[in-house]
Amino acid sequence: CCGRNTTILSEMSGYSDRFFFYTMDETDIITSRHLQKIPRAIREICESSEKEPSVVMVCMTCVDALLGTDMEHVCRKAANEVGLPVVPCYMYALTREGRKPPMVAVRQAVYSLLKSRKRRGDAVNLLGYFSPLQDDCELYDLLKQAGVKHIREISRCGDFDEYLAMSEANFNLVLHPESRLAAQDMEERLQIPSIELTRMYDTEKIHKQYGIFSKVMGASLDDRPYKEEAQATVEEFLKKYGPIRVAIGEMMNGDAFDMAAALSKYGLDVREIYGTVTAESFVRLRQLAETNGSIKVYSNLSPTMLYYADDETVDLAIGKDAAYYHPKAAHVFWNQEIQPFGHRGVTTLFREMTRAMEGHSI
């Protein structure tokens, strides 16, 4: 599964020439002889590449987790062999339900090469996603209002030197929970503190969060124009289509339960949610129970979804999973690489919803 997905995604994105696979057999697993070959393989790859890489990342799967492989030692040996940084990355699906699931481990590994530098008071890092926020996101403007001149995201770094400059940040802004551990690691190693902002789709909650952030920053941040624009887009949609029936899935850019609570508050009729219920989800579920207790919640992980019957009339499905369950509804996949955030995220969402209702599949 890991190899298949990596191959497909790397080919689609045009960087398949940067990925290499070591095929293990039973003898490798029993004798661990593959560990001796990894440093040599890395050297051969670096020597055969047209352009020498800046860093090499060695990704391990569950096999090495079960073997108890000391991949830190293997990577140190490889680094000495090629004279380049070699970083281990643990892609262990076995840890998915634990404290350090794969995507948390990957984020920590990605920032592990940053070294201590003199910090700049006008620099900040945005941690959370492997792709950038939408260009018109108000967060960039609000940070500039606070005097920030250098806003860095790993996905916008043009080269390795720009990546290393992330060590100069005065603080990190954590935009996704899976980056908390990476931020904690950077605070311990580089003394860069962090502030967390949550992606939400309720304009009032977004405004309140920015208000708290404004106090922490000690600056006056004005998000009102963006809030008013988002609210106007919501009102325009409701005026045109009314309280349509909506199904919301988890395969999209957002939390299904947060989005359901926000859309219900706006006046839409949320009928179904497809998502994994966590401790954080119950906060939104309690809100939904008070306003719309008839919402059905399904788990995509449950085998019983094989028997799911599309007997609920839905006008609009948000998320690729919800679209699968409701093929006749208007669809907004909302899983684009560029990440929506804040008021502009709400504005963009409702514009996409409008386009979908007009007959276009987004």
Positions of predicted regions on the chain:
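An N-terminal assembly and electron-transfer interface module characteristic of large anaerobic redox
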Residues: 1-362
